[in-house]
Amino acid sequence: MAKAIFVREHGSADVLRWEPSDPGAPGAGEAQLQHTAIGLNFIDVYDRSGLYSHALPLIPGREAAGKIVALGRGVRGLRIGQRVAYVLQTPGAYSQLRNVPAARLVPLPPGISDEQAAALMLKGLTAQYLLRRTYRVQAGDWILVHAAAGGVGLLLCQWARTLGAKVIGVVGHEDKVSLARRHGCRHVLVAGRDALATSVRSLTRDAGVQVVYDSVGHDTFFESLDCLKTRGLMVSFGNSSGPPPPMAAAELAKRGSLYLTRPSLFHYIESAAELKAAARELFAAVRSGKLKIRIGQRYPLADATQAHQDLEARRTVGSTILIP
């Protein structure tokens, strides 16, 4: 029988259990995938810990790649054996087999490996909408990227550089500085060592940045606001240090008539057409060499506990893949 990682109670990484799992036959409009690579993301930690509420038991994981092994009634345009990938709002990717709505599957083109796709569907599509839709980065823009050596951060910095932006990256440790520089950062700051707002003001000649991409949350929120230029945009899209603290709307005016948004990938790929258009642009950027996918760690799916512990301790670099 196939196996999966289960969460039967919310808590630390120790609650993850490797157990038998039978998804059954695919239903109408579904395809059954045999996973070949699964992406690890901080949202999986939020699901496991209970920050994001789901009914238990829960199989974590939002993105994966694999091959189709069965098709449900009414599915058109897909075939048995085809390589596909997905990102879903519903967890369930930490499994060897999974039934997935066929309309949410993206066929993989030549030149995109299963591991690349598993590292790209959530993180890469996140980078795509942040840079191309939430704020359309232009040549000459100063931008600030937190967690610049992480999976999303490395993609954001590379892509922004190809768009002509001047990228300031923030990393958690000294040993990640050179990696961030190689992936598009003009300047790299180290959290806890460099005074963030003071450093950004100095680098931008006191102008501030047009946009901050902040996936850290609680620990960086207010200082990120202080890095923005007048009418700048704060994009808060993650909670790796915990949710951002409460803030009165008047704070935005006091700091320069700032804009604040809290976007979600799934609102940018609501339709199949939006999903496939975003994936086409993303895959084209990878195949052209504009984006390099760094898979820094690979773990057997059965070792998901260790993978979660390393992610939470910030011992990972780039993307992390779980192998079923």
Located regions from the model:
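NAD(P)H dinucleotide-binding glycine-rich loop of Rossmann-like/cofactor-binding domains
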Residues: 46, 86-149, 159
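Glycine-rich phosphate-binding loop and adjacent beta-alpha segment
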Residues: 171, 219-290, 324
